[in-house]
């Protein structure tokens, strides 16, 4: 399974679980890029079945509903959905 990388200023380990067709996921990626943040993302819907199942299980540890986008910051904080203010606050600290 391949994580895609968007280079920027390192604000910790940031991982975004997304769908390639999800408007809110696209908005989250755009916000992170506008903020100049270094992050990794996985478009779960583009994965092969076996990888998709692994990633969905991994994601559900953070977000049991399995909804998108799911943003994990430093393996400590989880933000579900496009929560612009919450994302900005978490990454400015």
Briefly describe each language-model feature range:
Residues 1-4, 56-58:
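A generic local structural motif
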């Amino acid at each position: 399974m391949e994580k895609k990388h968007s280079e920027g200023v390192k604000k910790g380990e940031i991982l975004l679980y997304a769908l390639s067709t999800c408007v809110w996921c696209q908005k989250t990626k755009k916000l992170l890029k506008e903020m100049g943040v270094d992050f990794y993302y996985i478009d779960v819907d583009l994965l092969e079945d076996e990888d998709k199942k692994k990633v969905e299980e991994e994601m559900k540890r953070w977000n049991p509903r399995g909804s998108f986008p799911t943003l994990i910051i430093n393996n400590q904080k989880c933000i579900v959905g496009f929560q612009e203010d919450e994302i900005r606050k978490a990454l400015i600290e």
